[in-house]
């Protein structure tokens, strides 16, 4: 039997220049290997638990049942698959220094790795387009934004990611003891462009456009708001206190309007609008009753002036109520867009070092020497992104915080 065949079948040995087998040395010391295993295990657990909480929260919380949140469910599913089907094998390959599971699983492992990374950024690209259409075509697009349409968009995202990921990797032959990405220049550059740089550029351009539209809309709302606040000053309102009629300026209500404005500004992005509609209807009814009771009984000019003032006062109030509802919807869209912008920015920050060094290696192989340790560090920073999204939702979204607390408290009471 040929000696090279024997050494090829022994995974813990390597062949030296004389053709004799030598023990394969691990790439890290024992302490470093233990530390790597502990850190990566924590990343896996945080990724699985956090993204499972996201999925459960979207399906169980009324405030999070908006159709567009299905994108977040699919994105969380991709991160869970990364933590279960990719990271454990990457950890074994990193600690042992060689690939133990054969060439067949290597091909699927690499395909799944590229698939989930590509699907994450394509998801974010689809989310940015969804945000753009909801901002620029608010009425028409929101009527079309049904769960069925969102599910179709998610299916298209996964199909595009699979078409990009699987064919090149499954057609490539792999060594039994090495599981590496295709090292040809054309594949490296094309995969980096299609899987990261092109979708990332689309996201940046779309969000720049969203920012411009939001800025223009904010200035328009500011002008309309100032005009609305000046209108009530043209009339005065009559109130009856302790049997006496008084004339009171609408400026006395400014503090109440400021309080309502503060409440409105504090509403979170996906908060259910049912309670707000009830609150606004109760407020409108109470104001009508107050307007009816505020004027004294008919008494010549005073009663005519008082009724006329009440009519003039109710018109701006109705206008203000409709503006409050539209502003509430705009606030939700604005805060939802901000949270997703943070998610996209963190994704780009986590994966840009890897894709930059990977493409740089393809362009200048000889003149640009990139240490393996640095390349591996960037690779693992990209994996860490799978555990970050639930943390972002928790920090920036009150509804997710409430849903997570409810899920955890429910679980603790059962145990």
Curated annotation (Swiss-Prot):
Compartment list: Cell membrane
Record's GO cellular component terms: plasma membrane
Residue intervals annotated with topology Extracellular: 1-33, 97-106, 174-184, 364-376
InterPro entries (UniProt xref): ADR_fam, ADRA2C_rcpt, GPCR_Rhodpsn, GPCR_Rhodpsn_7TM
UniProt site (Implicated in ligand binding): 113
Membrane spanning residue stretches: 34-58, 71-96, 107-129, 151-173, 185-208, 340-363, 377-397
Record-marked site positions (Implicated in catechol agonist binding and receptor activation): 191, 195
Sequence ranges of Basic residues compositional bias: 276-286
Chain positions carrying an annotated carbohydrate: 12, 18, 183
Parts of the chain on the Cytoplasmic side: 59-70, 130-150, 209-339, 398-415
Pfam families: 7tm_1 (PF00001)
Residue span of region Disordered: 234-299
Any one biological process term the GO annotation gives: regulation of vasoconstriction
Disulphide bridges: 106-179
UniProt keyword annotation of Transmembrane helix present: yes
UniProt entry keywords in alphabetical sequence: Cell membrane, Disulfide bond, G-protein coupled receptor, Glycoprotein, Membrane, Receptor, Transducer, Transmembrane, Transmembrane helix
SMART domains cross-referenced by the UniProt entry: 7TM_GPCR_Srsx
Molecular function via GO: alpha2-adrenergic receptor activity; epinephrine binding
Family as reported in the entry's similarity comment: Belongs to the G-protein coupled receptor 1 family. Adrenergic receptor subfamily. ADRA2D sub-subfamily.
Function recorded in the entry: Alpha-2 adrenergic receptors mediate the catecholamine-induced inhibition of adenylate cyclase through the action of G proteins. The order of potency for this receptor is dexmedetomidine > norepinephrine = epinephrine > oxymetazoline.
Protein name per Swiss-Prot or TrEMBL: Alpha-2Db adrenergic receptor
Organism: Danio rerio
Gene expressing this chain: adra2db
């Amino acid at each position: 039997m040929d000696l090279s065949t024997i050494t090829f079948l022994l995974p813990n040995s390597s062949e030296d220049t004389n053709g004799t087998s030598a023990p394969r040395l691990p790439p890290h010391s024992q302490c470093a290997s233990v530390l790597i295993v502990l850190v990566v295990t924590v990343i896996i657990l945080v990724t699985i638990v956090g993204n499972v909480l996201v999925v459960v929260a979207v399906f169980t919380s009324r405030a999070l049942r908006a159709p567009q949140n299905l994108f977040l469910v699919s994105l969380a599913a991709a991160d869970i698959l990364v933590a279960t089907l990719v990271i454990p094998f990457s950890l074994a390959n990193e600690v042992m220094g060689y690939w133990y599971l054969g060439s067949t699983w290597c091909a699927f492992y690499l395909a799944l790795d590229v698939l989930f990374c590509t699907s994450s950024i394509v998801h974010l690209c689809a989310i940015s387009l969804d945000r753009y259409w909801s901002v620029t075509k608010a009425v028409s697009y929101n009527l079309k934004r049904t769960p069925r349409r969102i599910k179709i968009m998610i299916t298209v995202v996964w199909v595009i990611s699979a078409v990009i990921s699987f064919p090149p990797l499954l057609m490539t032959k792999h060594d039994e003891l090495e599981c590496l990405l295709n090292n040809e220049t054309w594949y490296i550059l094309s995969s980096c462009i299609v899987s990261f740089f092109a979708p990332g550029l689309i996201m940046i351009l779309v969000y720049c456009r969203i920012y411009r539209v939001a800025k223009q809309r904010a200035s328009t709302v500011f002008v309309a708001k100032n005009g609305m606040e000046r209108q009530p000053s043209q009339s005065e309102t009559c109130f009856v206190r302790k049997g006496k009629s008084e004339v009171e300026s609408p400026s006395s209500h400014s503090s109440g309007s400021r309080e309502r404005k503060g409440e409105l500004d504090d509403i979170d992005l996906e908060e259910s609008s049912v309670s707000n509609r009830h609150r606004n209807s109760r407020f409108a009814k109470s104001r009508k009753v107050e307007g009816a009771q505020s004027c004294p009984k008919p008494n010549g000019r005073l009663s005519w002036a008082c009724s006329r003032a009440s009519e003039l006062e109710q018109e701006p109030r109705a206008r203000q109520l409709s503006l409050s509802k539209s502003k509430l919807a705009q606030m939700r869209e604005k805060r939802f867009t901000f949270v997703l912008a943070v998610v996209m920015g963190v994704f780009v920050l986590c994966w840009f070092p890897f894709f930059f060094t990977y493409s740089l290696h393809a362009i200048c192989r000889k003149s640009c020497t990139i240490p393996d340790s640095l390349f591996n560090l960037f690779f693992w920073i990209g994996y860490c992104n799978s555990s970050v999204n639930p943390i972002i939702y928790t920090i920036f979204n009150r509804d997710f915080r409430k849903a997570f607390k409810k899920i955890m408290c429910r679980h603790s009471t059962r145990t």
